């Protein structure tokens, strides 16, 4: 059964899922839920240039999913969203337990044109 809250907030939910639906942003947020990280450390973990990373971080900041802290020239990011934490728990429950081979799911999605 679909809740009336979800119906009322469908546009916001879709925007949130669109931002979180990007592989790199999903990885960024996964790392940030473990604690604060510098821009350089995030870039290294997700294998992005700092310029590419800054574009992803801008989208996450736009939805207030991350918060920043500056220490001299270093900028540190952390997760600022309980919704992100909950989403990652759900995704880990679906994909983290080996319920389905992710490579097979990805192949099916590509065949379906998604």
Segments (PLM) and residue ranges:
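Beta-hairpin "wing" of winged helix-turn-helix
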Residues: 61-71, 78
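A short, surface-exposed loop/turn module that caps and links secondary-structure elements
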Residues: 48-53, 106-109
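Short, positively charged, low-complexity/disordered linker segments
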Residues: 68-69, 73, 112-114
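Residues within the DNA-recognition helix of helix-turn-helix
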Residues: 56
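N-terminal helix-turn-helix DNA-binding core of bacterial DNA-binding proteins
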Residues: 8-51, 74-84
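Amphipathic alpha-helical dimerization/coiled-coil segments
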Residues: 1-12, 84-114
């Amino acid at each position: 059964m679909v809740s009336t809250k979800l119906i009322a907030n469908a546009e916001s939910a879709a925007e949130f899922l669109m931002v979180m639906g990007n592989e790199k942003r999903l990885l960024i947020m996964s790392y940030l839920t473990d604690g604060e990280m510098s821009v350089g450390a995030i870039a290294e973990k997700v294998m992005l240039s700092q310029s590419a990373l800054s574009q992803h971080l801008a989208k996450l900041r736009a939805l207030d999913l991350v918060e920043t802290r500056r220490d001299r020239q270093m900028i540190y990011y952390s997760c600022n969203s309980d919704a992100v934490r909950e989403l990652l728990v759900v995704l880990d429950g679906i994909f983290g337990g080996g319920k389905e081979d992710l490579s097979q799911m990805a192949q099916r999605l590509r065949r379906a044109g998604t």
